[in-house]
Amino acid sequence: MSRPHGIPLPSAHRSSDDSTESMSACDDDEQGQPRPREGARQPTEAERVRTLVENNASVSLTLPGARDHGPGYWEPAARTVTPEGDVVLLVPWDSPTARAAACAQDDGPSCVMEITDVAPVAVRQRIRGRARLAGRLTAVRDDERARYERLLAERHPGHSPAYAEADRPAWMLVRLETDEVSVDDLWGAGRAAPAAVGAAEPDPVARHEAELLQHLHTAHGDQVRGLADLLGERGAAAGPAVREVVREVVREVVPLALDRFGLRLRCTAEGGRTFDVRFDFPEPVNGTGELRYAMHTLFAAAAG
């Protein structure tokens, strides 16, 4: 069985807090997050945005004149993407978002939804990416309600616009008609057409990623470290920037991200230098069963 090789991810930029530097073994990017090399299998911008919208990343909504009532007061309880690329949100009925949508005339007020993706395992530079969707906020018409409720139920079973308890408000469906979509994350920075986001599928691993990464970190730390130990083999044939880093003793290895294409680790060397490395699966996985087999194969190959 061939041994997997990690892909040290390139970036010539060091952040002002000196927290993360990545190795220039592949295509250099003058600044920003570590990027995969040209030609590597990776999700499109639209797929990455769709994944962020429909999973557990933190969301904030910006509306003209809306007051901030504190964290969690009017965050959407659930959200999904329509085939047209709009975003349907389930929000508290007494929230600024619901009031703005209910009072909307014609095109509705401008609205910006910002999504922040935070690593579920504690690492330096914990924010993994951000997405921004800008457009107009409108109420969901009565003749559209059943359709959007079905879309939400498919992605978020158990959430219902009619749900209410004594200590929490009832919910309202609103829609963000998107005009502009952008993303900046571990894969790169770019834009996506709303229609492309509507046609994309979220990453099948994303829904379980947080618990899987936490499990890898707490229960399989030695195996994760075994993958990082392969960096020495990679560095021997790489450029001087890679060799400079892999010569240092890696003192900490943390699983940073997991998707259908592979596993990304964040490594911290003895001198405090931090860099990322990816281990790609032989083929993209389509669910937890295939993921379990891919991870077993990866660890077995690393063990020799």
Feature locations, PLM:
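A general structural signal for short secondary-structure junctions and capping/turn motifs
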Residues: 50-53, 103-105, 123-124, 164-167, ...
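C-terminal edge-of-domain segments
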Residues: 1-31, 149-304
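Short, well-ordered, mixed-charge alpha-helical segments that flank or form enzyme active sites
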Residues: 70, 121-124, 183-185
